[in-house]
Regions:
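Hydrophobic positions within alpha-helical membrane elements
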Residues: 72, 85, 159-160, 229
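Junction motif at the cytosolic side of a transmembrane helix
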Residues: 222-240
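Transmembrane helix boundary and interhelical loop/hinge segments in multi-pass membrane proteins
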Residues: 60-83, 91
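Structural detector for helix-capping/boundary residues
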Residues: 71, 89-90, 233, 238
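Secretory targeting signals
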Residues: 1-63, 87-157, 163-164, 168-175, ...
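Extracellular/periplasmic helix-loop junction at the C-terminal end of a transmembrane helix
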Residues: 175-194
Length: 240
């Protein structure tokens, strides 16, 4: 019964952003008082608070525009019939970077726990694996969104600013307006936040269920396809 109560408290904490989205970054540990802080606890709180996303988007924006600013893309652009494939190659590189970064973060957090608390408790691996893979996919989709912004705008400062604003829930103002309009036209209890990548990052519970995984993966897949298609099309048509 105590274990069920702990799981229930963690799930309530993980889903608190569904109806109350704050602007800014909020990181709160789900660890129960008197219990050891697990690696999963810290990873969950940072992933939910979009701390990892903030780090990833900085690299994504710089990487997406590096070859354009250096002039390298102009040298090879004329030799490639399908320039959109250059975007696909970037997406593959970003996928590897995101996966390696996530794995490194998890290992680094274990080392940090050892230094800070003098112990390492990983957590429940049945919770860790599905949560880790789902958040990894959502973060990759978010990275591609930021890459698309950088490719379209072609300005590092503006692209970086917009990407950081996304991690800080600035779009919650727009989401609130969309929800209001949706409810006014008869879509009761409509919540656009559930259908966004950043929303799914924040709402994903620690004890993730099959429905959570499927819905989050579907949202991520839709954004991955849209961002890749949009970036490739614009890059193909644009005069470089």
């Amino acid at each position: 019964e105590q274990q069920q109560a702990d799981d229930s408290n963690k799930e309530q904490l993980s889903q608190q952003n569904t109806d109350n989205v704050n602007i800014g970054m909020s990181v709160e540990l789900p660890t129960e008082p008197g219990k050891k802080v697990t690696v999963m606890d810290v990873f969950f709180s940072n992933a939910q608070g979009k701390f990892y996303a903030l780090f990833l988007v900085i690299f994504a924006v710089m990487f997406a525009t590096a070859d354009i600013k250096s002039g390298y893309i102009k040298n090879i652009g004329g030799q490639v019939s399908q320039r959109g494939m250059l975007i696909v190659s970037r997406a593959v590189a970003l996928a590897l970077f995101t996966a390696i970064t996530f794995a490194g973060i998890f290992v680094f957090q274990a080392a940090a726990n050892m230094l800070a608390f003098k112990y390492v408790v990983w957590g429940n691996w049945r919770e860790i694996i599905p949560y880790f893979l789902t958040e990894l996919t959502l973060h990759y989709a978010f990275v591609l969104i930021c890459m698309a912004i950088a490719v379209i705008i072609k300005n590092n400062v503006i692209s970086m600013t917009l990407s950081v604003c996304l991690t800080m829930n600035i779009m919650s103002i727009v989401y609130a307006l969309i929800d209001y309009v949706g409810n006014r036209v008869g879509l009761h209890n409509f919540n656009i936040y559930k259908y966004t990548v950043t929303g799914r990052m924040a709402m994903l519970p620690m004890n993730v269920g099959r429905e959570d995984v499927v819905s989050s993966m579907c949202v991520a897949a839709v954004f991955i396809i849209i961002m890749l298609s949009l970036s490739s099309y614009i890059f193909q048509k644009r005069d470089i």
